[in-house]
From Swiss-Prot:
Alphabetical list of InterPro entries matching this protein: JAMM/MPN+_dom, JAMM_MPN+_peptidase_M67A, MPN
Cofactors demanded by this protein: a divalent metal cation
Gene name as annotated: RRI1
EC class (word): hydrolase
Main location: cytoplasm
Molecular-function annotations in GO: metal ion binding; metallopeptidase activity
Motif (JAMM motif): 164-177
Protein name per its UniProtKB record: COP9 signalosome complex subunit 5
Amino acid sequence: MSLSNKTVKELRQLLKERYTVEDELTESIALSSMRFKPSQEPEFHALSQSSLLKTKLKQQSSTDIPSYTHVLISKLSCEKITHYAVRGGNIEIMGILMGFTLKDNIVVMDCFNLPVVGTETRVNAQLESYEYMVQYIDEMYNHNDGGDGRDYKGAKLNVVGWFHSHPGYDCWLSNIDIQTQDLNQRFQDPYVAIVVDPLKSLEDKILRMGAFRTIESKSDDNSATSYYELETIIFDSELNRALFETKLNLHCVIEDDESEQISLNRLIDSMKQYSYLMDSKNVRTRIKLATTSERVSNENKKNIDYQNRSTRSQFCLNTQRGDSTETSSFGSMFSGDNTSDVDMEDRNLTEFDSTDTSLCINGEPSIHVNRVERSSRSTDNFHNSKKRMNSNQEKCHDEGNDMLQRNVLETDYARAKNRILASKIKQYERLRFYKDTFTL
């Protein structure tokens, strides 16, 4: 496959048709394709970062405790929160929100995550997390020393809430979340809790995020703590808007060198496993051939022994029949018939008077021996047939396992190979685009 003669459009089409759908390369944690829910109220259409900061500087302090109904959060904070949550995967993450308040609005300008111990359903902030939070805020947002603190046009950012993730089970507050939020509201209000669901956000391509505060619901007997949801409004900087309107329509994919190395390691591992599988199959085949040859040799020996025994038995039977005939001839000669012209008067019968003989006159014992041998032969044939049947079943079972393992390894090999090729083609496509764009 030659790529030198292909255009950038053809390269993108090649990636889309051959690699993107099969290898699911579109499932990236980049938020460029994620849609943000716009506000439906006219007063927030022209909302921007600079207008919020100007309003904050003009705002006069008030002793009245407002009832917060809106959360204004920057797009930068949304991307950082979603990025932290997606990196956490099925494990919950936690962080701090930085911003200020405007009347009944809580404005979130920035955020940062905390080093916490999380599970799939719970996240706990230890003492080290609070120490990290204090040091981070002092280094990044403290303007007293005139150092490298982040400048938001004179507006000082404070802690206005916290955020955590609910991977896969939507945005709401659990009982522990309600207790945590209520405790923070009592001692450092204004304070808001933001919950994000990274799994559903990636699945639906829409940011799943909710902002909540607690409220005491008083009844006749006791007072219980509940929560309500605030309307979330996302704003952006004018600089980002201008960049978004004038930027090239190019989808920049975040390249990960580790993913390419992982794919290469998987490719090599699949090749090693396939080679080991073939070697094991060859060894088993040689062992089976040697076993089969030995079994055939033993069967041939048994057949030869059986034929020899049958021959000896038949010879013994024929010999017995011949001796019986000769004995009858001797009896006829010693009978009272004197028609013979041979003078047999002086015969000596002492050697023939005995009725006992060492020869087997009756043929039944030989027949019994033949029957036993035939029965033994039938049993051997049955066992040999059973062994051959079991051997065939084991052979079919081994062939099925080998085929299954071979298919799995071939699939893994093809997938890893496609990922590596897709990564290389992407790199070439990007370089080709730069060359065509900036070459006169």
